[in-house]
Regions:
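Alpha-helical interface subdomain recognition
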Residues: 1-130
Length: 130
């Protein structure tokens, strides 16, 4: 999931650098730059939670709570990043020629493949009650 989110960020960033509106690159517009900045922050948080979960497992510690959190957050961050990158692309984001259209599909399916968000939330809630 973090890889999908990272791909969305990189794709959105490149498009914002390449595409111009009103004589300026899209990245120079505060709303676009803000979207990219928040994507980077959220991706870093999801990545670090994933690393922490893996560290717990590597050190023979219980990690079901952390793994569930990483799955839930990773899938949500991937979807948000793909959606933001699509918004940066504007109408072009829906064209199959643009990579972001595929990334959006990949991000959407993560909640299904990695366990539905509701199931992950239940796993987390049950573990918190232990």
């Amino acid at each position: 999931a973090v890889g999908v989110a990272q791909s969305a960020l990189e794709t959105g960033m490149q498009y914002a650098l390449d595409r111009t509106q009103f004589g300026k690159a899209l990245i120079e517009f505060p709303r676009v730059a803000g979207k990219l900045a928040m994507m980077a922050v959220e991706i870093m948080i999801a990545r670090q939670l994933t690393y922490f979960s893996a560290w717990q497992k590597d050190n023979d510690k219980r990690c079901d709570l952390e793994a569930g959190m990483a799955k839930l957050l990773g899938a949500r961050v991937a979807w948000a990043a793909a959606d933001n990158a699509l918004q940066i692309h504007g109408g072009n984001g829906f064209a199959l020629e643009y990579r972001i259209s595929r990334i959006l599909c990949d991000a959407r399916i993560l909640n299904i493949f990695e366990g539905a968000a509701e199931i992950q939330a239940q796993v987390i809630a049950r573990r918190l009650l232990d």
